[in-house]
């Protein structure tokens, strides 16, 4: 599939054009499938597009109740005594997506999924990363930097994160057809 370059005037125009592209694809897929898996980026760039998509769904241009979404990101280390408090913290991507997209829909998605970052206790994670420096590697540069936990670890906590949180989320996406 060739790449198409689209030049827009400003953020609002970009948001409308992007929403039209996504809406067109959703309508096409919903004609053929019972439900659609939609991957969602998090951050300020897609917020205008999300508002246009919510408006289109609310106007009946596509059936949002047949969509299952998966977000790409979630923070770890947000304040809160438990996972629920961290997930609903105003700086969490879960909260952000409710404010910017999910909460705007009259007909809710079948299911919305944000990675389980709120389950990770940052203090324990930092302690385990220091204690087991050979169990993980740092990949990428700048804002794109991430930690990769190796397959075999001496740390039960790092092993749990890899198996239950990271791999568990990927398996859920695959099971949904994404």
What do these predicted regions represent?
Residues 1-38, 58-59, 131, 136, ...:
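N-terminal glycine-/serine-/threonine-rich phosphate-binding loop
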Residues 1-2, 13, 62-176:
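Ligand-binding beta-strand-loop-alpha-helix segment within the catalytic cores
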Residues 7-8, 39, 82-87:
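A short glycine/serine-rich beta->alpha loop
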Residues 12, 46-47:
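Alpha-helix N-cap/helix-start and coil->helix boundary motif
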Residues 40-45:
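Glycine-rich beta-strand-to-loop/alpha-helix junction loops that act as flexible
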Residues 53-54:
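Distinct, well-ordered alpha-helical segments
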């Amino acid at each position: 599939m060739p790449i198409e370059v689209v030049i827009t005037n400003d953020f609002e125009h970009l948001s409308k054009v992007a929403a039209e592209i996504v809406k067109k694809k959703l309508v096409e897929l919903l004609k053929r499938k019972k439900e659609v898996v939609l991957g969602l980026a998090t951050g300020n760039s897609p917020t205008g597009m999300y508002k246009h998509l919510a408006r289109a769904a609310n106007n009946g241009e596509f059936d949002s109740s047949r969509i299952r979404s998966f977000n790409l990101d979630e923070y770890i280390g947000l304040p809160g005594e438990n996972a629920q408090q961290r997930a609903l913290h105003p700086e969490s991507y879960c909260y952000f997506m409710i404010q910017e997209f999910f909460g705007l829909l009259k007909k809710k998605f079948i299911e919305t999924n944000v990675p389980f970052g709120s389950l990770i206790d940052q203090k324990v994670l930092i302690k385990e990363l220091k204690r087991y420096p050979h169990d993980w590697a740092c990949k990428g540069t700048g804002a794109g930097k991430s930690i990769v936990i190796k397959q075999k670890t001496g740390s039960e906590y790092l092993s749990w994160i890899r198996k239950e949180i990271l791999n568990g989320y990927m398996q859920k996406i695959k099971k949904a057809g994404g």
